[in-house]
Amino acid sequence: MSNEFTHINADGNAHMVDVTEKAVTEREARAEAFIEMAPATLEMIMSGSHHKGDVFATARIAGIQAAKKTSDLIPLCHPLMLTKVEVELEAQPEHSRVRITSLCKLSGKTGVEMEALTAASVAALTIYDMCKAVQKDMVISQTRLLEKRGGKSGHFKV
């Protein structure tokens, strides 16, 4: 782990990291988030009886779109040409929650961690948005990077 912030320059100002001289490598990141809800809300999603339609399909598309828009949301992120974005949603009735996982890939000069985290986060937010009429006290939690590959810092896995 580095003890320097790469997005802070010598003057202490935020800046976008210059990746011009970095090598193009295969890069991949996986992230997850959870959204906890009442059993009845989760059952409504799982049974497909939600009045707004297929909650998981909508959240999946929202997560994919969010990964592609990460540089518009996070000021110092580079715009990336993603080659793969995958968002999976898993109902976990035993915990009364949904687990969201994301995978982002590309061949490029900078990593895709923020894209993976954004995909998982926005998918969770979309579930909240679609279900808030039924339940307002849902909890989004444990958003984290699970794994990253490629680049100078190498492989990281939780």
From Swiss-Prot:
Q: Pathway it acts in?
A: Cofactor biosynthesis; molybdopterin biosynthesis
Domain of life of the native organism:
Bacteria
What would be an example GO MF term here?
Answer: cyclic pyranopterin monophosphate synthase activity
Q: List the disulfide bonds.
A: none
**Which EC number(s) does the record attach to this protein?**
4.6.1.17
Provide the residue positions that the database annotates as binding substrate.
Answer: L76, C77, H78, M114, E115
Catalytic reactions on record: (8S)-3',8-cyclo-7,8-dihydroguanosine 5'-triphosphate = cyclic pyranopterin phosphate + diphosphate
Q: Is Cell membrane among this UniProt entry's keywords?
A: no
A GO biological process this protein is involved in? Mo-molybdopterin cofactor biosynthetic process
Entry-linked SUPFAM superfamilies: Molybdenum cofactor biosynthesis protein C, MoaC
Q: Which InterPro entries does this UniProt record tie to the protein?
A: MoaC, MoaC_bact/euk, MoaC_sf, MoCo_biosynth_MoaA/MoaC, Mopterin_CF_biosynth-C_dom
NCBIfam families named in the record: moaC, PRK09364.1
- Family membership noted in the UniProt record: Belongs to the MoaC family.
General function of this protein: Catalyzes the conversion of (8S)-3',8-cyclo-7,8-dihydroguanosine 5'-triphosphate to cyclic pyranopterin monophosphate (cPMP).
Quaternary arrangement and interactors, per the entry?
Homohexamer; trimer of dimers.
> Do you know which PANTHER family this protein is assigned to?
MOLYBDENUM COFACTOR BIOSYNTHESIS PROTEIN 1, MOLYBDOPTERIN COFACTOR SYNTHESIS PROTEIN A
Q: What is this protein called?
A: Cyclic pyranopterin monophosphate synthase
Q: Which organism is it from?
A: Shewanella woodyi (strain ATCC 51908 / MS32)
Gene name linked to the record: moaC
